[in-house]
């Protein structure tokens, strides 16, 4: 599903800025000038200009005339995107149940085992690892659907929710619940039970939406 290719400097800058905006490093309403970003990132203004243009096309930035203004993702945006995910991801899971491979199931199993390891690991905060493994599970689900359209659409929605997802899984009780929901989805996929996979995924996303709705923006 994913291709390995050389990433240009403009692509690297785009991905870095997108990640920084979606994780909250740059706040909504903050102005990002080419000069400032050139100094911060240590690159010329040409790839920055290209990256900013692409971020404006993604509606993550807007042009104010004095620089690019961070639009980011609001709580309302997040809830709207979850309404889309609730329906689409259930359908993707239903499709995945019919065509998921043993290798993809094994990758899911390994991801869930690691997720459990970090949730149960005592000591310092492991929210970043748990969030990344949560993303990995969902990416595998999208890939397993066998549909490029589902994969690209759902991957984009999932990525744009980064800040809210991290805040949600930082709550240990929600991280535990989410893992149990992932396990139920995995078991349905293992049985190639499309309707069960759809229903478990639907419930998982409704619970995740309700949890995120309680997160302070």
What are these regions, as identified by a protein language model?
Residues 65, 88, 110, 177-180:
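Alpha-helix N-cap/N′ positions at the starts of helices
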Residues 20, 24, 63, 115-118, ...:
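A short secondary-structure junction motif
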